[in-house]
Amino acid sequence: MTNWINTVSRDHVERGVRGRFTQANHGKPHMLRKMARGDWIVFYSPKTEHPNGAPLQAFTAIGQVADDEPYQVEITGDFQPWRRNVDFLESVETPIRPLIDSLDFIEDKSRWGYKFRFGVFRIDDHDLDVIRSAMAVDLCA
């Protein structure tokens, strides 16, 4: 299994949680194709809304990929994003700042936001555990 962070505004995360899906990189399929059933995805939201929301800087959802391949949906004639189905877990929105020193994927703590510019990226099991614990995710429920 691989662990991922997907950088998405909170309003888009909430839409995905309601619909049980994720998109990445403005609907492009590339990173979604790298994911496999059972992979963990943590959602980080720099803002409350896209594109002009208030700063948030929090982990806003967590779940596991629930299908085998990306699929395309038609939103409008010229916007047909790719998606993956996700089984979301109950969690609490968690600010990132108290976790920065504990997260290995943030190599330069003074420029902690840099990594999120990549949109979707892998994290190790340690970082997943730190985030999952902070989000009060109970895997036994």
Curated annotation (Swiss-Prot):
InterPro entries on file: EVE_domain, PUA-like_sf, UPF0310
Gene3D superfamilies in UniProt: ph1033 like domains
CDD domains (UniProt xref): EVE-like (cd21132)
Signal peptide: none
Family: Belongs to the UPF0310 family.
HAMAP family: UPF0310 (MF_00771)
Full protein name: UPF0310 protein Mflv_0785
